[in-house]
Amino acid sequence: MTIVFRLAGALMAKGGAVQYRVDPKSGNRISALGLGCMRFPGAPGRPDVKTADAIISRAVEQGINYLDTAYLYPGNEVCVGASLERLGLRDRVLLATKLPHASCKCVEDFDRFFDEQLRRLRTDHIDYYLMHNITSPAQWERVVALGIEDWIARQKAAGRIRMIGFSYHGSAADFLTMLDAYEWDFCQIQYNYAGERYQAGTAGLLAAAERGLAVFVMEPLLGGRLAGKLPPRASVVLDGANDPHLRTPAAWGLSWVWNHPQVTMLLSGMTDTAQVDENAALADRALPDSMTATQLDAIARVLTEFEKSNRVPCTGCGYCMPCPRGINIPGCFAAYNASYAHSWFTGLSQYFTASAVRTSEAKLVSNCVKCGKCARHCPQHIDIPERLDDVRRRFQPGPVTAVLKAFCKTRS
């Protein structure tokens, strides 16, 4: 079971002490809230430097001491490394990044990618290093054949990697296989109240904790869908609960994850300092096993309403992009779900924005040629071409298609 305690002093959060949970393998004291850096604002591949500095600085002020990035997040490692150097904060945080193992064809590639990551992050070691986006034990077996186990041992002995783990997006059964495939220090799983039986799920969380691993949680709000994008009937349930400590859907979702004593830390992709302050205040109060039966019942009723409208389990991560045909895949799926959560006209409006307003010509889902490039990169294993067909049937009866194309022509 995860040990929880508070520290006073330099890492005191505004309004109270910071909650930490202990990594059972290393003894590291990790803030219950970690900063996921992938969603920093900015242009694609170019995170906004000033905003990143402000977010990282405020996070450390609030006691957050775990930062997560990855080689495959365009421009992100460079941004994080430069920010930590400018702010003089590298020694005050635990830094995590990930190996793009699918691009490794020989043992020398492990060194090539890792050395580049150290340069990008302006550091001589990585505190928590992950095999990125494992979906099947076969992926691990492939890099084992290349010599990854000996390579990890050498990096650990040299102090360049402190803790080794993997991020996971596969089936529940394969997750158990992965847990026993190597002497892991930690794992990172997608977990939220809408996903107890999805991917690793609750069974995987318990299995990892039983093996003495630290468990880090990603997508605690399902890419924001459990925050500001709940269907109206679900929002009514939370409003009716009138809980003085849980005033927003995000507060409910994050607190539900923290309620599990097996969770060491959850990552939140915070995009401004206000979110940092709000989530840090929640992290201070959200102790394991602290939610009441009434609160958990409210979550169960929200989940019932959410599942009625969650037609495509897209989190908006963007791994499927760019589409060779220019389709805004996450935007189209968000519009599709909104058409069931709110109304058809609401969804159509969002689809119009995603497909026509922000483009010089209509990038309709009917442009899809089913090349499958997107589906190969989806962590949620969505059959994207097939689901885009659903979007087309929902939003592109003849008149709508004609209007979208005509709108774009008037601007060209």
Regions found by a protein language model. Name each.
Residues G36, A70-Y73, Y129-H132, S167, ...:
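Conserved residues at the C-terminal ends of beta-strands
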Residues I64-N65, L84, E183, A203-S412:
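Structured C-terminal cap/extension of enzyme domains
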Residues V78-T97, E149-A158, E210:
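Alpha-helix-loop-beta-strand connector modules within alpha/beta enzyme cores
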Residues N65-Y71, R162-F166, Q188-I189, M265-L267, ...:
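Short catalytic-loop micro-motif centered on adjacent basic/acidic residues
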Residues D23, L35, L67, V80, ...:
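Conserved, mostly hydrophobic/aromatic
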Residues D91-S103, Y129-H132:
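A short, structured active-site edge motif that brings together acidic residues
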Residues T2-V93:
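N-terminal binding-site loop/beta-alpha segment at the start of enzyme catalytic domains
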Residues A43-P44, S57, E61, C104-L221, ...:
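Glycine/proline-rich, positively charged
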